[in-house]
Amino acid sequence: MSSFSITRKKTPFQKHREEEEARKKKAEDETARLYQEFVESFQGDNATTKTFVRGGTINPGDKPKVDSEGEKSKDGGSVSKKGSRYVPSFLPPPLASKGKEPEKKREEERPREREKGKTRNIDNFMEELKREQEMRERRNQDRDRQGDSSPSSRFDELPDDFDPSGRPGSFDDGDPQTTNLYVGNLSPKVDENFLLRTFGRFGPIASVKIMWPRTDEEKRRQRNCGFVSFMNRADGQAAKDEMQGIIVYEYELKIGWGKAVSLPSQALPAPPPGHMAIRSKEGCNLVFSGQTGPPIITSVPNQNSELVLTPNVPDITVVTPEDEHLRHVIDTLALYVLDGECAFEQAIMERGRGNPLFKFMFELGSKEHTYYVWRLYSFAQGDTLQRWRTEPYIMITGSGRWIPPPLPVTRTQEHEKESASTYAAGRTRRAEVERTLTDPQRDEFEDMLRALTLERSQIKEAMGFALDNADAAGEVVEVLTESLTLKETSIPTKVARLMLVSDILHNSSARVKNASAYRTKFEATLPDIMESFNDLYRSITGRITAEALKERVLKVLQVWADWFLFSDAYIYGLRSTFLRSGVSGVTSFHSICGDAPEIENKSYADNMSDIGKINPDAALAIGKGAARQELMNLPIAELERRCRHNGLSLVGGRVMMVTRLLSLEDTEKQRGYEAVDEIPKHPQNHSTWEEVKSEREHIKNSYAEVEMKEPVNLPTTIPIPQPELKAFVGKEKNELILPASKWARDDDEADDEQKRSSSSGSDNTGGITFKADGEDLKGNDCVRAQPDNGMDEEQRQKRRRIEVALIEYRETLEEQGMKNPEEIERKVEINRKRLEVDYGLSGPNEGNRNQKSIIERKEKREDSQESSKKRHRGENKSQSPPRKSSTRERDHDLGRDRDRERHRDRDRQHDLNRDRDRREKSSSHDRDDNDRSKERDRDWRRRGTR
């Protein structure tokens, strides 16, 4: 993470303020130093020195005379100056004047000698300034002399005294932090792209610039210069040491440090794969692609070295072996020979003599041997199995050019164009080239995933690795997706890897270069991951383990929804994929991945044949025939777009995508039907059947838009989630296999309730209630038998479809984890009533008629109970003495009667609903039995006619 830290630059105001403070401090120090020297000079002058006093005659009345030299003398003679040379008076005037001239010179030099005796710092500073001025004048004179012979230009070569070791020269301002390299003596064929590829192998480059000639004189020189600015000093130093003296297009490069330039926040993109210059280890030739031909770069042992080029020798083309196994053997052998050197190769040749697999090592002219030699050299230059240089180069001095094989096509042409395109630096955004993980990095990441657990430290370490290699996000996501879709992975490891995906997505918004690519990459692979988790969830036999896995996965999906990483439709599609039942018609993800084409064709053929078998009954009952046909007619691109938008996998082809879309639609409908469950099962006294019916009609109409668009024979389609009927369709077309145990259990419960109610009534009323109930039930049976006898074929088909749909709906609820039988029965009954209303098999009039008959029966029962209670009270009164009733007792009796009436009303409503449900169950069962008996009669008639 440290590579992404950016040093904060100072503003111009801060720089100006610091310069002013430094200048002010320097002036104060200089003033203090001068003042100290001034004080010391005064202290040195206070010391008294002995002087010579010349003797002479002094007359009291005479005044001292002033001689021509400005000296006073009392006797009229000349008095010499202090410290001057003594001249005898008897010498003639000419000789005396000659002696005075050298004396004056000595007097002028003595103050200088006295000053030299005590040196001061200011004197040293002045001497230094003088020396610098003399050196400056000398350089100007040399430059003038050179200008007389040839005019100067910014394209001139470095001077002979230029020191390439890094000491300050003509092009170095002495800044130790500069990263800008001056590249002189460039060939006119060299451009910025060439410099970028040449110097890009040493490190990230900030900018590349070539000073193109402007005047005719500069063009006649036939050489240019340029600047290459690195992002850090170490890379620039390595490039300077390596490229100093290299010959490119017969021009020897002269490299030095240039003036520091401001660095951008982002370096230029590295050269694309296949165009990267590889660093030489032992001074071997290096080849780079130019505009007119491949330039040859060699190390320069001396000043008279020449370009090594043999144009008359044919090129050597490297061809990749067609046999994949042989190519793998050659690649592996080249890697081992590179490590073990000649001794290992010699041992292999001795042991492999006569082995056809190592025949290429002895046939020096074969294509396999050429490929082997090229692989050795390629690995030595730093190439890998997936990436290598594609430009021709000279491997051996005096031989022809070696032309490497083309790179394998692993990316789309559009991505190649993006990676190859470059723009002007600092003006437009450059296309980033997504790199791949190196072999050690990939092995390290795979080891992390194998040992990954739910410990926070391990997940954090793996997440840090992913962010550090965000520029290779594509391969990181590929490895992680592959590990999450393996069928053999254990549950804890798979959950831990899902947590790692969640951590990477959470940090995809961090200020890390290319970190946001993880969200886009995972968005394309998460549907496949959820398909694998669905297979794992449905294969778990333990209920506790399955619930724990379900809780973990759903929590992760909910967290993603809270983070707003993806759209709600996408998250809901992932959740539906994970919770999808096994009877939804979608083939298992792992079975599809094992044999995708055959499964696709087989599933499509089976689907079409099944539709033909169950048509018209099953197809119309499920309500998917027209919708499936409509989706099958859509273009494949539109299907993929819908699946991607809804978080569904694309694996399995057109048929599986259509099946997933239909399953998702059924799940969405089921979510809408959950709202119907909120309707009270036992309506209060103020709630009528018409109100409940209107509310259900409102809910049903809200989903009318998603029903089939093509007309069918039914009034409306069945809006419930239904998988295919393969499990319930036997060999015969119309023979339906129903679980008899379920219906037998319901009938037994109904019979037991009737027996208990009749027995309780007979005990209380002496058989009066039993008679009334029997007559009422007999009447109801007669009324119920009339529509059964007159029921036409269409109504029987509707009843059959409803029962099949309810069976499937019950199994769907059980597979979704619903364990409460009462809750399941309640939802099934609600669905039954809704379907009967939709098909027109029941209505509000029938409900009112049933309510009226049940209410009358309950009133008769309650009247009989009241009469029996009065009779018992009469018997008690006859046995006990009479007692007068008080006002308190009468009030108590009135309150008790009111409570009894309330309980009676509540029980009456409850019994009404229960009887109606029981009657509907029994009627459907009787009709099914009647249908079976009629079918058997028809079969017997057919056999009799035969």
Curated annotation (Swiss-Prot):
Residues 757-767 have a biased composition (Polar residues). It comes from Arabidopsis thaliana. Disruption phenotype: Dwarfism and sterile flowers when homozygous and semi-sterility when heterozygous under normal growth conditions. Reduced inhibition of hypocotyl elongation under continuous red light. Plants lacking SWAP1, RRC1 and DRT111/RSN2/SFPS have pleiotropic phenotypes due to altered alternative splicing of many pre-messenger RNA (mRNA). PROSITE patterns: CID, RRM, SAP, SURP. Keywords: mRNA processing, mRNA splicing, Nucleus, RNA-binding. Residues 1-29, 41-183, 740-797, 836-946 are annotated as: Disordered. This is Protein RRC1. Its main location: nucleus.
